């Protein structure tokens, strides 16, 4: 399993922990370092609400990425639509959204460095 270069915590709520799903989240988190190399930490919460314990019910994923001066938080509520396992789709979609936000943050951060100081 590829390990990211920053602290990563993957937690499961209201569902059994899945080593395969955790490894899947680790792989996606490791890819974030290719976009922005100053990530301080990342937290992933994967949960299935209490009233939806059966397989095929909605999965909620929250990805929180801490970078200098900001925290990027993305959530994905994925309802099944015939996909083999909606938890994997929700994790993938949340990390894709986090990646897009990191790209925007990196662009903004880069341009901020280019603006001359008025001091």
Summary of predicted features, one role per range:
Residues 1-119:
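N-terminal, polar/charged subdomain of small-to-medium soluble alpha/beta proteins
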């Amino acid at each position: 399993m590829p390990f990211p270069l920053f602290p990563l915590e993957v937690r499961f709520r209201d569902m059994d922990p899945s080593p395969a799903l955790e490894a899947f989240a680790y792989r996606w988190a490791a890819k974030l370092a290719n976009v922005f190399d100053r990530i301080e930490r990342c937290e992933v919460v994967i949960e299935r609400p209490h009233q939806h314990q059966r397989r095929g019910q909605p999965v909620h994923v929250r990805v929180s990425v801490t970078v200098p001066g900001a925290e990027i938080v993305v959530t994905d509520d994925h309802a099944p639509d015939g996909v083999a396992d909606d938890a994997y789709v929700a994790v993938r979609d949340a990390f894709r959204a986090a990646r897009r936000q990191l790209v925007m943050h990196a662009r903004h951060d880069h341009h901020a460095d280019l603006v001359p100081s008025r001091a």
